[in-house]
Amino acid sequence: MKRSVRWVLSVCVAITTLAGCSPSPQRQAVESISGADLKLHLDILAADEFRGRDTPSPELKIASRYLAVMAERYGLKPLLPDGSFLQEIPLMVTELDALRTQVSFRSSGGDREFFYLRDYGVQGRGLASARVAGRVLFLGLGLSAPDQDWDDIGALDLKDRIVVILDPDLPEGHALMTAESPRLVRRRSWTLLQRGAYAVLTVVSEAREERFREKGLQFRPARDVSLDPTGPGASAPPVSRRSTLRAEIRHDMASVLLGVSRDELSSMFSALRKGDRVPAREIRGGRLDMRIETLKRTDSTYNVVAWVEGSDEQLKNEYVLIGSHHDHLGMQEDRVFNGADDNGSGTVAMLEIAQALSIARPKRSVVMVWHTAEEKGLWGSRFFVENCPVPVAKISAQILS
C-alpha cells in the first residue's frame, strides 16, 4: 500500500506539472490523497465476492459501475457522446459445447471415454472447434532450454502430433525456476504448437490433483473472448489468431494415455522436482480422438471513461490520458484470482488521482480510462482507441499503470 501511495503522489506531481497548475492547489491536491481511501477501494474491488472480475461477468460490470459512481463523486465529468461514464464494448464469446464435445482413447486394452470438466479442461484463449486424432507423444516437461542444459524436444518431429507434458510444482531454487516461471506452462505449450503439434495436453500438478480429489472440483469452463465485429463501434475485424488446442488433464486420464500406473506417474513428477529429466517416448498401440465443438454468443463489458476539463481556454484542448485495467482473471476451480496488484492497485490509485485533480484543475484536460478485457486480449484499450471521444492527435501524453 505504501508503494501505491508513492506511485499516486508521483503521478499527481507529473500530471499537474505536465498539464500545468499552480503550486498551492497542487499541494492541496497531493494532501487529499489518503492511504485509507486507497485501502478501502482495494478491499472492495479485490474482495472474493467480485470473483476475480473476469471478462465478461456480472461482477466486472458491478466493478465498472462502482468506478463510474466514484469518479462522479470525486468530481470527474462524463466524456462519452451519450453523457455516461460507461463505454459499452460488444463482445463475441466462444464457449465449448459440452454436449457435442467427445474425447476417447482406443487401444488394444479397450476403449475409454473421457468427460469434459471432470477429466480434462480446455484452454480458452484461441478456442475453436477442432477435430484432432492420432498417437500420443510424451515429452516429459516439454521444455527446450539448451542454455540450461535441458532439451526434451531435440530434433523430434512434432508435426501433427498430440503431445503430453507434465506440470510439476518446481521447488524454490530449482535450476529451471526463473522470474517467468508462473508462465512456464503457457510458454512451453505455445512452443510445441509452433513446432507443429496438433494439440498439447498438460498433466496437472500433484498439488492441484489433490485439490481436485479432496474437494470434488472440476476444471474451469473454457471460453474465448474477442470484439464482436457486428457490434456498435467495432468496425474492425477481430485480430486473427491461430486456432490451437491446449488442454489440461487429470492424473487418471494421464495414466491411461501414457500406459503407466498412478505410482509411476508420481515418480515422474518426483524426478522433475529433483532436476532429473523424464525421457520422451511415443505411446504405441493407442489412438486419441478429440472432437471439440464450440458455441458462440454475444455479451458486453465496459470501459469507464471520465475527464477533468482543463482550466486554460487554449490548453484545455490538449489531453493527458491516465489508464489502468480493472478486469482480472476470474477463478480457477476453488481459487479466486483477486487481482489486488494486477491491476486493482492501479485502478484505485486512479480514483485518488481523480479526487486530487478535481481539487487542482490543470490547464490541460485529463482523461481517465479504466480499461476492461485487458486480460482477454487488450480489447478494452483497442476499442477505446478505435472509438476515442477526443481527437487522438490532441493527446499529449498517456500514463498507464
Residue ranges and their predicted role:
Residues 1-11:
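Bacterial N-terminal signal peptides that target proteins for export
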Residues 26, 108, 119-150, 235-339, ...:
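Soluble metallo-hydrolase cores and metallopeptidase-like ectodomains found primarily
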Residues 34, 114-237, 309, 337:
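Extracellular/luminal Protease-associated
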Residues 43-46, 138, 162-166, 199-203, ...:
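Structural recognition of the beta-strand scaffold that forms the well-ordered cores
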